[in-house]
């Protein structure tokens, strides 16, 4: 179901995600961006250049999901808006640059995915009820043309996948959920799982 939030409510969710990531060092040097769907037409989105660790409502804009450009929108806004258009059940999206996600996105770029398998914390993802499975996190090559990159991402993603995120090679991680609260849970789970995966691979 598509949410029905006013701008102030949606902005609170954006701020919560941004500060959560900022407090953990996942959005260094003003990187990263966060959004919350308001309805079928609009989303609240971090403005370009905002310090995510100290974000307030002045650093959040209202963007049209159809894709009309906002003068303060981040260059990566098209990646958020394309996900909202493709999947009405998505209520919030985060983009962060955690160390493990960024390193693994380069290490596995040639295979096109990072495989998580057997980790108990995969059950933090919505719809996952067992550790006894594998989840492939797709990796797409980076591109400074973010409209083209957004189209590539949507072409690459498996619409039936249970994985609530994807990686951009050498860049970072996109994560989503039905709400800001669920997205925060997914962010924390991804960071733990990718850190565990990186440690395990490095120990081999």
Curated annotation (Swiss-Prot):
Zn(2+) binds at residues 95, 97. Catalyzes the dehydration of methylthioribulose-1-phosphate (MTRu-1-P) into 2,3-diketo-5-methylthiopentyl-1-phosphate (DK-MTP-1-P). It holds the Pfam family Aldolase_II. It comes from Parvibaculum lavamentivorans (strain DS-1 / DSM 13023 / NCIMB 13966). Keywords: Amino-acid biosynthesis, Lyase, Metal-binding, Methionine biosynthesis, Zinc. Binds 1 zinc ion per subunit. Pathway: Amino-acid biosynthesis; L-methionine biosynthesis via salvage pathway; L-methionine from S-methyl-5-thio-alpha-D-ribose 1-phosphate: step 2/6. This is Methylthioribulose-1-phosphate dehydratase. One of its GO terms (molecular function) is zinc ion binding. Its cofactor is Zn(2+). SUPFAM superfamilies: AraD/HMP-PK domain-like. The keyword Metal-binding applies. SMART domains: Aldolase_II (SM01007). It catalyses: 5-(methylsulfanyl)-D-ribulose 1-phosphate = 5-methylsulfanyl-2,3-dioxopentyl phosphate + H2O. Belongs to the aldolase class II family. MtnB subfamily. GO terms for cellular component: cytosol.
